[in-house]
Amino acid sequence: MPTYKLIVGLGNLGKKYEKTRHNAGFMVLDRLASLFHLNFDKTNKLGDYLFIKEKAAILAKPATFMNNSGLFVKWLQDHFQIPLANIMIVHDEIAFDLGVIRLKMQGSANNHNGIKSVIRHLDTEQFNRLRFGIKSQNTSNILHEQVMSEFQNSELTKLEVAITKSVELLKRYIEGEELQRLMEYYHHG
């Protein structure tokens, strides 16, 4: 069995959540899958996953809802024997303005319940993340209301640019580019 890279987008299933800020991870993974001419289709009760065989990569979206995302990540890690260094979690980040993306190689959950679940199930903070900024000046200051709100029409251009940039970064990661180099390019470029 090849050593896979696992890229997991966090979000919540269902039409009700589809366009919310909290589903930024799903939005990025859907676009990344389409780049490789793939579509997510329920493959497991815990979530959906796809293989990019020629790149030894797995794309995944948990079906466990945000707060239990770690269940699926752990199942995938165990099932496909994926080293922690090859796990990349794509998630919304309320601390960053919409349009900002940042790689993080390890660390705390920063109050993100999906990341808390992944940390709990993997029993470590030692995994990679792509943090996708979703903060808006035009929505509620109440955290739950802000992350569960939909993107406004005035934000759609910024959203599109950020998704495109995220997909480009992840494609380069899948193709073997070093995380440090990607950090330097996308954090400053």
Swiss-Prot record:
Query: Where is it localised?
Result: Cytoplasm
Pfam families, from UniProt?
Pept_tRNA_hydro (PF01195)
Reactions accelerated catalytically? an N-acyl-L-alpha-aminoacyl-tRNA + H2O = an N-acyl-L-amino acid + a tRNA + H(+)
Identify the GO cellular component terms for this protein.
cytoplasm
Question: Mind telling me which residues the site (Stabilizes the basic form of H active site to accept a proton) is annotated on?
Answer: D92
List residues binding tRNA.
Answer: Y17, F65, N67, N113
Entry keyword annotation includes Cytoplasm: yes
Kindly state the subunit structure of this protein. Answer: Monomer.
Q: Which family does it belong to?
A: Belongs to the PTH family.
Function statement: Hydrolyzes ribosome-free peptidyl-tRNAs (with 1 or more amino acids incorporated), which drop off the ribosome during protein synthesis, or as a result of ribosome stalling. Catalyzes the release of premature peptidyl moieties from peptidyl-tRNA molecules trapped in stalled 50S ribosomal subunits, and thus maintains levels of free tRNAs and 50S ribosomes.
Q: What is this protein called?
A: Peptidyl-tRNA hydrolase
The organism encoding this protein is Mycoplasma genitalium (strain ATCC 33530 / DSM 19775 / NCTC 10195 / G37)
* Lineage of source species: Bacteria, Bacillati, Mycoplasmatota, Mycoplasmoidales, Mycoplasmoidaceae
